[in-house]
Amino acid sequence: YGESVASVISQIKAISNDLENGLDREELQDTLKPGAARNAIDCALWDLQAKIDKTPLYNELNINLSNEITTAMTLSMDSPKKMAAESFIYKTYDLLKLKLGAKDVLESIRAVREAAPYPKLIIDANEAWTLEQIKLWQEELLSLNVSLIEQPLPAGKDSSLSNFEHMVPICADESCH
């Protein structure tokens, strides 16, 4: 979203004196715009505070670890064979997120499902699908136990989904930026 490693490093360097002079997390929110640099510094400041207090970060944040949170293991877009091999490693996980495009969609999902039959699947279509493809694929996606399709259409094209009766839940990503 318009960021690069160089731009993030530049933003961090630009406020390094402020950080050395005690810039805190609250001041950081007004100093840097939302993005990777602010997030990295915010995380580092939380970690620093926990170390100063000699307590685990989850205590600093008042997080009760007895309430586990399920998170998805993300598999990057690749050939169906390579995605299946990677998913096999995570076959005991509860949730896998597959990053896909417009190519080899069903083949990739089938290959992953065969290698990892247990996890729920989230499909991140990366804005690469059309409404016609969703209509064509939705029954098979349902049969492959796909739990969610993330951002199937290009950002700004979501209105075509408003009257669409989908079998698999659909959520936004890039459309929210």
Predicted regions and their residues:
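Structural detector of well-ordered beta-strand residues that form the stable sheet scaffold
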Residues: 72, 122-124, 150, 169-173
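Short, glycine/acidic-enriched loop or turn micro-motifs at the edges of active sites
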Residues: 102, 127, 153-154, 176-177
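A short, conserved beta-to-alpha structural element at the edge of catalytic cores
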Residues: 144-158
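N-terminal capping/lid subdomain adjacent to the active-site entrance of alpha/beta enzymes
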Residues: 1-121, 128-135, 139-143
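Catalytic alpha/beta core domains of metabolic enzymes, predominantly
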Residues: 156-177
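Residue-level detector of anion-binding/catalytic polar loops
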Residues: 56, 147, 169
